């Protein structure tokens, strides 16, 4: 746009809502409303909208919109007057002609012939006779797809049978038949637009020309768009008992015929055709009588339907594929709406200008926040224009992972004043690792009066929190070894164990926890007093740590399997304590009394604790594996039996 003083040159669009009726010839000379808006769908810049709603009858529009009237109603300055006239209306109904598979109207010819054999009769009938019932007829033991009558007699002179056939064949046709579709009301008006003493812009506007009838060029600098519902107050003639027949011998290629006479024609042939052939065969009717009867029906069916309101309709399209008829209507248009858009830019047709607000971004700020929270970005906007501005701010696109609120914020800002706008920004990432992300978000500010826009971008930064499933473990490869990580709180992962040597991470505890084991083994737990595994001194053998199950219970992470493992291990400890303390305690007891001054109960206690611990550890290695659990239960039964056997008192009789 070109700046003129403190104003902006712009486009101007005049919007006229027109109403027509058929009962008077008064001219419309003024508009009811005039407003000044931004932009149009056809030209850049501002829009001058003039609306007219008539409350009286009129068949002609002759509007004069003076420069002073434009200024008084909008505050904008126009350098020329604007006039618009609409006249010379023509209204009609357009009826499309549609091919729907209707049969043609045929003429008919009777045929008969005598044959020596049935085969000769059959061949002649199937090659020459017409099918008018879509049923066929039986000839001997065969059924034809055509209609015919036949008779036979014995010729004593030749000593053989003779055969005679009677049938009808089509003898030309009058034309193809089409349905008449629902009508479209078409209007045609002449438009003339002029700014000052410049060359007028003219156009013919009609809703019957498809796209060009909806939006037409009104010269080089203006466009006219019809957008209302056409209503004349009169319905077009109804199509009730009409069809159309197409042929070169009809004026314009089409003729309107009666649907009832057409149906009577075909119903008579289908229902009475075979009866007529039988009458001919029996000698009751002659060939000429039947031909005259059928062709009379055909002639009547193709006659012009003079009683129809479309009998004298003008042919708009003579082709069979897209035929159309035109019926003139006497009434005038009522309530059509028209938009007139006039270019008033730097090189436009009319010049209009108006002081407007002018936004300028004087400061901005970004945001830094964590993933589970949000931040706010903001701008300060100053009105550096000569009039109050209505400034609308909106947050635009952001970098990947960042989203800004889509809400638009509008404020009225006086000249020289500043307004602040802020928008909420959030962050979303699918990453599982903790990291920082940076990006930018755009903010655009528009003066709704002029359409002028200014924009900027601000920085945003967010910290990604590590994410994981609480209680679940994962395995990663590091330096060729499996490293087990756990998720204690659902937000971050931490290192749990490293599987070295031949050990690999395998699932245990219902597939939510891992353990370092040799390939091909399952179950288990490792590291520290409550680690999942511990290593035997000297031998270096790694064993599952029973105390790990107690850790799961104390931490609240135990499941049903953990409880069962602890219960079985505890029973094994009690059984081992009792068995070793009683059975082996007696042996060690004897040795101790010779070399160690300790009471028997102390020795049994120590031996029982050591034995119970070793048996409990061995049992835990088994119960961490489902198959081992079954073997362990059987072992406990055997151990219980041995315990009872060893502790049973001897009874001497």
Curated annotation (Swiss-Prot):
Description of how the protein assembles with itself and partners: Homotrimer stabilized by interdomain contacts and numerous Ca(2+) and Na(+) ions.
Disulfide links within the chain: 129-167, 398-441, 468-487, 499-516
Keywords: Calcium, Cell membrane, Disulfide bond, Membrane, Metal-binding, Signal, Transmembrane, Transmembrane helix
One Gene Ontology biological process: plasma membrane fusion
Transmembrane segments: 560-580, 605-625, 626-646
Record note on domains: The extracellular N-terminus has 4 domains; the first 3 are structurally similar to fusogens from plants, C.elegans and viruses, while the fourth domain is unique to archaea. Domains I and II are discontinuous. The fusion loop in domain II is stabilized by a Ca(2+) ion so that it protrudes from the molecule.
Signal peptide start and end residues: 1-24
GO molecular function: metal ion binding
Residues in compartment: Extracellular: 25-559
Lineage of the organism: Archaea, Methanobacteriati, Methanobacteriota, Stenosarchaea group, Halobacteria
Superkingdom per UniProt: Archaea
Protein family: Belongs to the HAP2/GCS1 family. Fusexin 1 subfamily.
Stretches in topological domain Cytoplasmic: 581-604, 647-653
Record InterPro entries: Fsx1
Residue numbers spanned by region Fusion loop: 155-160
UniProt KW Metal-binding keyword: yes
Gene: fsx1
GO CC, any one term: cell surface
Keyword hit for Chaperone: no
Lipid bilayer topology: Multi-pass membrane protein
Location relative to the cell: Cell surface; Cell membrane
Chain's role: Exhibits fusogenic activity. Mediates cell-cell fusion in mammalian cells (bilateral fusion).
Chain coiled-coil ranges: none
Protein name, entry field: Fusexin 1
């Amino acid at each position: 746009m070109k700046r003129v003083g403190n104003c902006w040159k712009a486009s101007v669009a005049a919007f006229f809502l027109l109403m027509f009726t058929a009962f008077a010839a008064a001219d419309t000379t003024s508009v009811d409303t005039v407003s000044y808006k931004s932009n149009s769908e056809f030209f850049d810049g501002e829009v001058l909208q003039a609306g007219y709603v008539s409350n009286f009858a009129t068949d002609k529009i002759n509007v004069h919109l003076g420069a002073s009237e434009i200024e008084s109603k909008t505050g904008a300055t126009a350098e020329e007057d604007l006039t618009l006239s609409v006249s010379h209306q023509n209204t009609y109904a357009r009826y499309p002609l549609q091919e729907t598979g209707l049969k043609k109207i045929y003429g008919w010819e009777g045929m008969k012939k005598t044959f020596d054999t049935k085969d000769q009769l059959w061949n002649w009938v199937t090659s020459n006779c017409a099918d008018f019932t879509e049923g066929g007829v039986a000839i001997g033991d065969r059924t034809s797809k055509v209609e015919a009558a036949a008779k036979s007699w014995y010729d004593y002179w030749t000593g053989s049978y003779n055969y005679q056939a009677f049938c009808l064949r089509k003898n030309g046709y009058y034309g193809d038949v089409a349905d008449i579709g629902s009508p479209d009301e078409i209007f045609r008006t002449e438009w003339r637009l002029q700014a000052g003493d410049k060359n007028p812009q003219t156009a013919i506007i009609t809703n019957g020309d498809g796209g060009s009838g909806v939006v037409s060029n009104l010269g080089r600098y203006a466009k006219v768009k019809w957008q209302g519902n056409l209503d004349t107050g009169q319905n077009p003639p109804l199509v009730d008992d009409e069809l159309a027949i197409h042929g070169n011998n009809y004026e314009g290629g089409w003729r309107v015929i009666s649907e009832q006479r057409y149906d009577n024609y075909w119903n008579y042939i289908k229902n009475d055709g075979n009866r007529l052939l039988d009458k001919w065969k029996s000698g009751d009717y002659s060939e000429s009588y039947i031909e005259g009867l059928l062709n009379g029906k055909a002639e009547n069916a193709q006659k012009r339907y003079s009683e129809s309101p479309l009998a004298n309709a003008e042919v708009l399209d003579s082709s069979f594929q897209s035929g159309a008829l035109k019926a003139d209507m006497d009434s005038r248009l009522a309530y059509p709406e028209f938009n007139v858009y006039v270019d008033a830019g730097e090189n436009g047709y009319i010049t209009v200008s108006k002081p407007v607000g002018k936004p300028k971004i004087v400061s901005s700020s970004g945001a830094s926040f964590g993933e589970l929270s949000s931040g706010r970005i903001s701008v300060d906007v100053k009105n550096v224009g000569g009039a109050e501005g209505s400034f609308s701010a909106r947050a635009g696109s952001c970098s990947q992972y960042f989203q800004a609120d889509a809400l638009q914020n509008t404020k009225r800002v006086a000249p020289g004043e500043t307004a602040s706008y802020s928008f909420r920004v959030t962050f979303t990432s699918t990453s599982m690792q903790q990291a920082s992300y940076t990006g930018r978000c755009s903010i655009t500010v528009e003066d709704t009066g002029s359409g002028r826009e200014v924009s900027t971008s601000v920085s945003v930064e967010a910290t990604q929190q590590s994410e994981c499933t609480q209680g679940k473990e994962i395995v990663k490869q590091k330096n060729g070894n499996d490293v087990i990580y756990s998720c204690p709180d659902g937000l971050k992962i931490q290192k749990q164990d490293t599987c070295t040597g031949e050990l690999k991470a395998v699932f245990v505890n219902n597939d939510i926890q891992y353990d370092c084991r040799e390939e091909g083994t399952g179950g288990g737990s490792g590291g520290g007093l409550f680690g999942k595994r511990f290593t035997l001194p000297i031998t270096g053998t790694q064993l599952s740590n029973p105390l790990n199950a107690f850790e799961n219970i104390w931490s609240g992470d135990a499941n049903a399997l953990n409880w069962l493992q602890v219960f079985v291990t505890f029973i094994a400890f009690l059984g081992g304590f009792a068995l070793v303390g009683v059975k082996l305690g007696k042996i060690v007891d004897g040795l101790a009394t010779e070399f160690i001054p300790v009471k028997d109960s102390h020795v049994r206690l120590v031996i029982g604790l050591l034995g119970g611990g070793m048996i409990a550890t061995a049992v835990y290695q088994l119960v961490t594996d489902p198959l081992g659990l079954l073997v362990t239960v059987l072992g406990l039964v055997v151990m219980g039996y041995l315990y009872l056997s060893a502790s049973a008192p001897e009874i001497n009789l």
